[in-house]
Amino acid sequence: MIGETLAKIFGTKNSRVIKSFRPTVNHINELEPKYQAMSDDELRAQTEVFKKLLADGKTLEDILCDAFAAVREASVRTLEMRHFDVQLIGGMVLHQGNIAEMKTGEGKTLVATLPAYLNALTGRGVHVVTVNDYLATRDTEWMGQIYRFLGMTVGTIVHGLDDDERQEAYNADITYGTNNEFGFDYLRDNMKYSRGHFVQRDHHFAIVDEVDSILIDEARTPLIISGPAEKSTQLYYQVDVVIPRLREEDHYTIDEKARTVVLTEEGVKVVEGGLGVDNLYDHKNMEILHHVNQALKAHTLFKRDVDYIVKQGEVIIVDEFTGRLMPGRRYSDGLHQALEAKEKVKIENENQTLASITFQNYFRMYEKLSGMTGTADTEAPEFKKIYDLDVVVIPTNMPMIRKDYPDVIYRSKQEKYEAVINEIQELHRSGQPVLVGTISIDDSETLAKMLKKRGVPHNVLNAKNHEGEAQIVANAGQAGSVTISTNMAGRGTDIKLGEGVKELGGLHILGTERHESRRIDNQLRGRSGRQGDPGSSRFYLSMDDDLLRIFGGERMSKIMDTLGMEEGEPIEAKILSRGIENAQAKVEAHNFEGRKHILEYDDVMNQQREVIYRQRREILSGESLRPNIEAMIEDLTEGIAAVHADDRTHAKDWDWEAINDDMYAQFGIRVQVDDEIKDKIKSQELGDILYQTAIEVYDAKEKSIGSDQWRNLEEYVMLRTVDSLWKDHLLSMDHLREGIGLRSYAQQQPLIVYKKEGFEMFQEMIDKIQEEVVKLLFFVRFEEEPEKIEEIKPKEQEMTFSHGGDQAVKKKPVQRKDDKVGRNSPCPCGSGKKYKKCCGA
């Protein structure tokens, strides 16, 4: 009551925001005669004028009024449509990076042209996001007339385009497309092996049409690209035949503490002979080498009935801490398949995640995000919390005169359907068009059968019958028309009233059930009463409806009994309407928590995804990877020194054999240190010696085939390793996510555990990338002409597309020119810090 009184005196926040735009609207209107007086060529030339103003230091705000006035005039000349004042306000709301709630028929599509043109003047591209290919294509052709008139280019992203077509569309000033296509293109770009093949530009500015549908309704379903983990299981069987021939010590050595196993030189020869391979470490045989290593682990490090059991033809992991079986969990990186080959059971192909992202995290990448919809105000808190978007309700151009009648409630669904059919028949006889909204395909088909029996002609629009959607919706306003539609069908297409329909009361909306969300109900109502047209709406409900049955509970039934309802008799009561609204509020709160929950988990993956994608882009940048490789070699040699060298004992007493074994396992080299040096060497100096030895070997390998070819190989090996281990990490994170809910039984917070263990797994993957990259580069040998190396690229994988924190700035490793500075030595830059904490970080 007090709030209402204050609102009357001071106005609501929304009314104050709208009022603040009025002076700008007035200025745009004052500019109208100036632009009307221009010739077509003069008007078109304004685009270059605006671009020059921006180049000279003006801001978008400085040129907003002129740009909007130019778009308005171009629209009049091309489409014969003039932007209303309220549409100018909508354009300003979008430009500011907020959500404009505009009722159906208020021209959201036309509104988007204003901020799209203005922001495209920067040359960085604008993405206009729609819910389906039809709307993306329609809006490109329709609104594209305005942009092209003003000298702008327009592109469309729809399903079925090849990369060249996509690249061309993204390079346009303004690009229309669906949310799915934009998201999948981002994921696909980050799986490519050349920057020249990327299709997307920066994520600069996005205008999301039907923003509630895309950012809220679809937020619970991530975009996923998946593919078979292995194309064939045959290689596992072939390798498994060879491994049992190997003998410990002669052919391989085991480090039980580190749980690693390494082939000896003799072992490599046996494997090469058994598989008919000339050189196991040739770059062509990297996949075979990976299978050999996994099979070797399966046979030597993993024991049946200790690490796993075989039950009903399946290899089931045993939890090492609890001893419990973990059905459904699988080792990653091909190890599980190697165990299946070892145990002679069926090798299962895994369809694993190759890349995924939620819409929440995709759209939060844009520097500026905005949206339009007819219904957003009910979800305003969620838009603010998740996306930092304010919702501004734009006034209608003409007063809304639609009559929204109270709900009528029946005891059973059958009684409700009978009443609905009677109402439709009566409206059809009078000639008033009716749009019947259902919440399921099943309901729409049930009503269609009942109407057919009564002989009432009608159209049905649902997911099974979506061909000609736009035509069916467009005809729904003709006299005598009966259209049965699922609630979300036909969004984006206006229902225009046919001749004589206004006199009959306009389009009548008949809802057959309340949706879980008030917003969806409002969308259905909003199909009627556009642009000041007459119209009406009413919902028919029953106690059998899911919403009332599940969330209304016994209380609603008791109220019905108290009111003394007879069979077939409807009831209208405010207390029931309040009960329905309370039920909807409960569901909306529950769904919000679900979406927030998904986002909290995906935020963990998002931070990791950003690191990997940034690393891939650095690899593909064309800059030399030599400094990165040197830093990896340094870390690994220092690690070996740290494990085996202790300054508390004399260097002669260090385990030199173990040092050499580790150097051989990682680099394929052995280090000879004179006794004279051993008398005075310290652990840090050992790290320097190991590093220098490794670098000399690395330089020799590079020299043998030439620097340019070696750079190509470095890029190939790093990409292949990052992609392979990232793919396996995604699978491991999927498994962790699936089982994390059970941690609550152990009095643990699942999200906290997921963050902690996910970070540990990610750190392990980063370490493994370093080890694998260096090992492959040191062990690779060439039997063919070196110039063929540049042709090597990882194989494209079969892919399936399903709709299902602060970034640290990475310093580039310092490239050494003179003698190496010890990691613990003072930094030569003079900061006073240790080198590893300063320039060597």
Swiss-Prot record:
Cofactor-binding details, from the entry: May bind 1 zinc ion per subunit.
Location of region: Disordered: 518-538, 796-832
SMART domains reported for this sequence: SecA_DEAD, SecA_PP_bind
Catalytic activity: ATP + H2O + cellular proteinSide 1 = ADP + phosphate + cellular proteinSide 2
Cofactor(s) essential for the protein: Zn(2+)
Keyword field: ATP-binding, Cell inner membrane, Cell membrane, Cytoplasm, Membrane, Metal-binding, Nucleotide-binding, Protein transport, Translocase, Translocation, Transport, Zinc
Binding site for ATP: 87, 105-109, 494
Gene3D superfamilies on file: Helical scaffold and wing domains of SecA, P-loop containing nucleotide triphosphate hydrolases, SecA, preprotein cross-linking domain
Membrane topology: Peripheral membrane protein
The EC number(s) this enzyme carries: 7.4.2.8
Translocase keyword on record: yes
List of residues binding Zn(2+): 827, 829, 838-839
InterPro entries, sorted: Helicase_ATP-bd (IPR014001), Helicase_C-like (IPR001650), P-loop_NTPase (IPR027417), SEC_C_motif (IPR004027), SecA (IPR000185), SecA_CS (IPR020937), SecA_DEAD (IPR011115), SecA_motor_DEAD (IPR014018)
Matches recorded under PROSITE patterns: SECA, SECA_MOTOR_DEAD
Subunit and interaction comment: Monomer and homodimer. Part of the essential Sec protein translocation apparatus which comprises SecA, SecYEG and auxiliary proteins SecDF-YajC and YidC.
Family the UniProt entry places it in: Belongs to the SecA family.
Protein name: Protein translocase subunit SecA
